[in-house]
């Protein structure tokens, strides 16, 4: 996600000091599937005899999903969409609250058993938020850690209390989301997407809540774990030490040394006395926090250990990581067993009774047998080995040809994902993008409609690019990235308005052939067509209900009375969306942007219902769509056929 500064205005200007970017994310697949690697897993056990378990997954595609789990099937029942970058971790804090963190520097809370409503956005971190930890017996307490060397402890009950000031009242005090003193937004600001899908921004400064900061990390934090009671917190990262904290005060209690590389994962037993750590040094270590020392080291993996999951009694540990392998280790006897291997590094594990869910850098999620309630059953199959004490011991075994044979060959259930895009090329016509995904399929996209117009299958990307080369010259008006596993199209003003084509070259029927069409303006109209229609319907209904038969322009004027946009009611506002700019409603793109309040948000274009505050959109975007007005530029260029 392209990060931009705060939307502060000068006292003499009616426009933001720095214009915001608008991004739209394209997809051509079912929304019930992830399109990038899955970073995190959380299992919610059934609360009733007739209910089912739920699996929550968070992905590098920026979304979370809820899966209803049956014996031989998993059905996606909800997609949680609001983060604008990778979802890095998620925890359950109570029966109905899901907490997620992201590379967009935020935490978000969700009502996990409803329709995917984001209830709050918590802002405190200055960099990517990489990990979370929750207290089981004190479900209000959640800790977060990130790349900024920051660890915060949140009391969700206090953080999520109703605010004393409404968004409108705050707007009167601060028209642009900036305090009267000229400072930036308060330390913690919360963005709500209500059940009606209306986006509004609030801050919790009015109730004075600030999370507890556990200060002491000098470098990035990658792992957290918290005791069930919420009285003990452990953290680890690039400093190679395990730090122990009192989360109630943020004070350090001890520091444990032993690992020789980054600490990537941590676990605590239910009492908070025993701690397991996994590291990029390929080692798993067991710490006795009462004795403040490492009591066992396990050389099981041949590469970085990225995730751990323990049995309920903390007698055995499942581990996975960069070596593509899932191991089961008896912590008392040091006996280890290779359960399975795959094609992708393992990012996170989640036990569900006698099964274990495995998330990897692939978009699919696999379920494997684990015998979590009686792991000794697995060891009866044979093939185990004794874990060494030194990291090179497993590597030596591997080199000598005695690599363990996996117990299981195939998963018992696969939740399929869609292949993510890993390569792209913008073609010379500046309307088509050629892509290649993880399956090797090459596709041609028309970005002004957000659809795939040709699927070439598994062909040479370079040869197809040469074949599609055209001798045309048109200015670059958008940029592209594939960080989320999909095509993200970025529009920045005024550059995005630099490209024009003749209507005849776009095959627009009924428009004079020599009329020039601005590609960005028409694309914006297509993206916001649903929002404009809902907005018109909403204000028209309100006017009709009040017995007001005023013109549509009057309705628009009333809706923008408190807006920062000065509507030119004499401007010709052609709301028609031409066919080359009609976006799919079957696979609708998502918009990622931020308004004057400075907080990014993400939403499908078909979920925009007209109730969104105009201040949540970039100024230049609405000025273009509502007023047909473009920013001034020195040179206008259009398509030249050679």
PLM regions with names:
Residues 37, 51, 76, 83-86, ...:
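WD40/WD-repeat beta-propeller blade-loop signature
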Residues 42-52, 90-96, 132-139, 224-230, ...:
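Loop/turn segments within WD40 beta-propeller blades
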Residues 58-61, 101-104, 144-148, 156, ...:
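Conserved strand-to-loop turn within each blade of WD40 beta-propeller repeats
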Residues 64-68, 90, 101, 107-111, ...:
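WD40-repeat beta-propellers
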Residues 453-642:
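C-terminal scaffolding/assembly regions of large eukaryotic complex subunits
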